[in-house]
UniProtKB/Swiss-Prot annotation:
Gene Ontology molecular-function annotations: glycosyltransferase activity
Domain GT92: 181-463
Record lineage: Eukaryota, Metazoa, Ecdysozoa, Nematoda, Chromadorea
Bilayer topology annotation: Single-pass membrane protein
Name used for this protein in its record: Glycosyltransferase family 92 protein C35A5.5
Annotated source species: Caenorhabditis elegans
Amino acid sequence: MTKIKRQINNFDFRRIKILLKKWNVVIYFVLILICFYFIIPIYFPNNDKMNLWLSSIKYYLTYPIYNESLTKTDAYIINTYYYPKSSSLGENAIGMILLMNRNTQRDMTKYRMKLIASNSSHQSVIVTPKFLEESYSSCPYINMVAMVNTLPNLNKLEIFDGERKMEIPFQMGKTTAPASVIICISPQFVAEQWQLFVAHAHVARKFGGHLHMYVTSIIDTFFDLVQEYERLGYVTIDYWMRLKLANSSVDSVEPNLHSELRNQAGAQSDCLYQYKEAAAFITFFDLDDIFIPRGYDSYFDEFSALYELHPNILTFQYTKRETMVYNKAKIEDINFEELFGHTWFVNEEDYGKVMTKPGNLNSMWIHESWNIPTNRHHVSKSNYIIHMQKPVDPDGTDPVSYRMSNFEMLESMQLNASTLIPIQDDLERVLKSSNISMTAEDLPNKTYYFPIIYRCYYEKFYKKPKKDSCPNGEGCLIPQRTGTNCIHSDADFKSGPEMWPITYHYHVNSKWSRTKGCHA
């Protein structure tokens, strides 16, 4: 015991004090990191405001170390929307949809873009938007959304890198919608399955929905049919471009080949921002995703009931159930009781799609948003999406015979005839009172491009999913066919001045282009 006391007395505590003084900054920094990264999140796991504040603190603590710009890249500004008043974004808000190169810096959500906003009162302000990322794969280009508040009566918006400026075209977000429920349809390319469109359009109309359909390329006769439905108020057709860099550099990465699934997530985010202040509810479906309310007379009623039952949920997801489908050669032969009144389904659920209030969401991926906390996202078990994935041709040919589905008779999933008869009546009314019947005479009665594209997708990534890959339909061989022509989205493509670290590209004057042959 005496020996231990002697050792303690001989120990030089002054040296420890000096060392602590020298390292006190480092020690404090480590303690702060432990506090913000580990301790506070334990006590506030579900507090969104606290989590947002913590994220901001973490960013400012680590920005000097990790977030330097790494390399010169390109970005494409798809659309920019301005909201004088927004319930979710605030006043004088900007929402910008971009395709950006993830290699610009380590965390693209922390990218420091500078925007100069000017208005009609000769006021100007420099603002830095917040970024949200929506991507899953390892593609170089990722879907990004930039949000920031600017000035009243905005009339000019520019990107500024410290030396050069580039003006950004913008448009007003919609203030009214054709229906209270908007159904965003993912971009169609080499589209020919007109039967799916007719089914979706009439189902949506019956239950209070409106289709907003993006088109990259589509069979010309199918496009004529969709335009007739647009005149009748069933659908809004929108452009979705194959992106072109007007002035690319030697190091520029081609955007179409190196973006996830043709940047479908970008279209979902774009649709969200168009209707952010106009629709009560918004969904993000493919053309072959048909949703029919169960126990309710309309989409609005079912969605409202879900939110009343789960008041803390921001987004709902409905899973998919594949159903057996036989296409008809003529539009007059389509029968909704035959389409949806049977019981043949695959007895398993596929990754679903999202429904939400537009104000609850600021960005969107393909199947869900990665920016919604898991405890604020709910997978509904009260209903499902009818997935008309692989329709059989009118002559009985199965276009996807190499990937047969295991159908079973599931009596519990049968829809009542009373639900389907009014939809059939609506189709027959339209055929009698419009130009639809005449326009439909030239529609293809058998699929040609669908099995080609499906096979390409299957061989490229569905057959053998690869980790860290970039799933994309680019490179699919699309053989041309005599007498089959397409309508393509087109525009005047522009490039801004070379900037550091990002050069920006965009398009103006969107238009439909009729061409011989079809390409994706």
